[in-house]
């Protein structure tokens, strides 16, 4: 299906949120699955609210997720002359008309309709107006068909039909001459030869109006697929009050792009009972026809579970690159000693996010300045001094270099001292990390190296002496 062309068309009035990211992902996967083209278009016709900062945030979010585009980014503001040509075409063909109704008049009509129990819609006052004071402020409206219905077969929701009597004459050009959203979208999609429009179902009500415009302009009507919305745990539409919604916020909180992609694709789409999909598997198996009609509920616990999976199975060298900014935010400028990939291998099994991993990795780069005194108090000082002396002495003479060897060495120390492993392991873990919540002793010694391990034991002994 090489003629398949899809687009992601965000408005640059904020960041890339998870709902928009899922829409982008579905479009990207559909294009990649069928060998089609994925286009990025920035819908910046709202010049008052659109910002370059928002554009940058959207591009940054998509790049982080790995959603590369084949064409674009295109900007709607570059096409204003083209939109005006199409407005004039409709005027010339009698398919659009000028409207001089003032906002207060329209509001009065809306209130009257509501009071009478009618659906508010423009009543066509200027549709057949003979006098046309062109020097007065006016908008331009599309002359929509008044009879019959406008229907389409949605790939997700099935057939949807709208009685034309319920659709009013859409404004396509404002009083200042700028085109409106629904009009620009139709022109762009038509000229970009978009074959499939995959977007959120909050656009369903726009679709019949856009179909009428396609037909009036003589353009082919694309195939539509409207994706159900994402809800919070309270079944309300996902928003900031449910937690982070920005893609970049999830990056900064320590989530991996593959985890977020995997989670987003499962918000509405399924492939049997499978939960974990690699990028390649998503491309191979995704089909918009398998997206459900019901809204999806955002579950942070499921995202955490997926993120933990990708951290646990991730390449330590790659994770090291991703972890460095999180350590830098904690004052660690140099992650070379100990080797960060080696450190990560001791933490992968237990961390759900990179932020959590960075917090747990901190002791490797910053020797503890204080110790868990409550945990140390469970052992008398003579015992602690004996353990620290025995371990330091054996480490000074050892040629061990790997965690299993250090674990064996500790067992020998326990046997020689007549101690149980917890009576050696816990004090040593506190001496090296400051806490009882740390990886295995052998792993810590391997990552820190023998010299740094001995130095930390000596500092702990000095702490006990005071």
From Swiss-Prot:
Any Pfam family: tRNA-synt_1c
GO cellular component labels: cytosol
Cofactor binding: number and manner: Binds 1 zinc ion per subunit.
Cofactor(s) for this UniProt protein: Zn(2+)
NCBIfam families linked to this entry: gltX_bact
Protein task: Catalyzes the attachment of glutamate to tRNA(Glu) in a two-step reaction: glutamate is first activated by ATP to form Glu-AMP and then transferred to the acceptor end of tRNA(Glu).
Protein name: Glutamate--tRNA ligase
